[in-house]
Amino acid sequence: MRSKAARQKSLDFDQRGSRSSPHGFRLWRLIALGAALLLGVLTYFAGLDSLQIPKNGDEFPYAHIARLTAESGHWLPLQSTLDNMRNTKPPMLFWQGILSTHWGQDWTLWQLRYPNVLYTLATALLVGLLGWKCSHRHIATGLLAATLWLAFFSTYRFGRPFLTNAGEVFWLFLPFFLLLYRGKPGVDSPWGVPLFIGLCTGIGLLYKSFALLLPVGLGLAFWYWRYRHFRPGEFLKRDVVKLILIALISLGVFALWFALDPDPQSIWNEFVIGENAGKFDPHGPSYLSKMFWGDGSIWVLATGYALNAGLLALVVFAVMGHGLWRAIRLRDLSDDEKFLWWWVLILFLVFCFPSQRSSRYLLEAMPALAVLMALVWFRLSRWVLFVTTLLCTLAIGIIGYLGWLLQHDVGQQIYSGTDAVLLVIMLAVLVLSLLIPKLLPWLTLPGVFAAYLTLTGFLGVFDGPMGRYSTRTQNQVAGQTVWVPYSFNAAYEQYRFLLPGAQIRGYRSDAGIPLHILRERYPLLIIQEPLNAADCTDCKILGERLDLKGRQSDEEIRAMVHGDVARHLFLRERLIDNRHDPR
């Protein structure tokens, strides 16, 4: 057994610079970390109503379902015009969207997304409190843990859009937070804590899937067993009934969907069989070959935590290596750290078995990873932080270069001098931190947020006058049917935010239909062209805007790598009126 002094040392993220430090230095450190956390919070609200924020393609199908369900005037059944996508997810996210948009009356991206940002910030609060508790109540560690959680790219990408992840992560991390934060009283609670955990887990399942009960249940079971020092008899006597209660309550909450929906058979066919059982179908090669080879293998999933961290990927690898060294050689991991590492490992092992493997499935353990990183942040090699800060600097420089390319191709000033000055200041501060290694622990995370804000600034032009249709254009097509291009499920839903009041219909932009055929078919039509495309001389153009091309082919990516970036990244979109076309 390790001594109490060894446990104390392992829990303290920076024992030498904490209580032994002068009061002024401790205060300065709290101010610096608090400022970094505040910068992170502001970053999450910046550009929240943008169509271009980092996300994945599921946001618009989910918005489509929420909008049609709101228009129906009923909570259930869920509504959709998409084939086999009416019950693609449980109803909690869609109910959230219905409430936040006041039954679709305030249909804006901000209204759809802000509840998820609040969920993400609530998770940051849990992470901060856990960091504070695990470090023997060091406020600095709590601030650092919350900031790290917000700095993960997976949090930024999936914790802001109208997706299931923000609510799912909050509710499914809350049980682990409660057990670790309360300690023995929470574990020994006969029914109060298990009841609360069951309710939390059930709500989390209503955001994503009943299948998540498996990793959560295994994680909780292992934690209870670990609290009993791996004594099977005591575990069976004191905790198995609690785990059964948690499972029954959580499944009971999830079963409300079946009980309240007038068409439960469709839920079974579309969600249980199609959405969940289908994840064990290898869709091509055999199950085992896909498990061990290809881009969906377990080896790719093993990099999932680092991929989720984004610019902090190297830090994740360093923390994992450091944790492994301490577990095997030093044997000085605290009990709190062991519990968190076990949850990180259990979630990875569970999601090795479905044939569809993605780093997105590991999001529930990212809060635990943020706490673990905060506990050792100031013990990391300066080279790890140096490379991470260098990556942030390069990312900001590349985004600035893309902005210059766009402005050059458009042929007019679209970014202000203030934007350029702020860009130079951010780069100068990061370069200074690279030259003065002592600054790295304090400026690496602000550097990550600076990269996110630079991306927001670059994308801002697509949400300004040049990236939106004018009010005059919107009024001209209000109440009219406008045919818009799309290449992914329900991607046409975004045009309801660009042309509010218009009746939006989609056509496949990847079908290769010539322009003259499109003009014959559709009275009001939106087309997308490269910036350098020739003007349509006989077209009646009601409006146009700048846009980003969301998906590039392999050939286009190769061309971009060789320097032909603007032609394959930027688009000009035109709204054409064919209603009086003499042809």
Locate the predicted segments by residue:
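Short acidic/glycine- and proline-prone juxtamembrane loop motifs at membrane-interface regions
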Residues: 112-113, 157-168, 358
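Membrane-interface transmembrane helices that cradle and orient dolichyl/undecaprenyl
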Residues: 11, 132-136, 175-194, 204, ...
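Transmembrane-helix motifs of polytopic, lipid-linked glycan transferases
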Residues: 114-136, 174
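Transmembrane-lumen/periplasm boundary regions of multi-pass, lipid-linked membrane glycan transferases
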Residues: 62-68, 157, 199-203, 207, ...
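Extracytosolic helix-loop segments that constitute the early lumenal/periplasmic catalytic or substrate-binding loops
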Residues: 43-47, 61-85, 92-95, 99-102, ...
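Membrane-embedded architecture of ER/inner-membrane glycosylation machinery
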Residues: 195, 323-506, 531, 537-538, ...
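Transmembrane signal-anchor helices characteristic of membrane glycosylation enzymes that use polyprenol
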Residues: 28-59, 226, 246-262
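Transmembrane-helix signature of polytopic, membrane-embedded enzymes
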Residues: 36, 127-151, 338
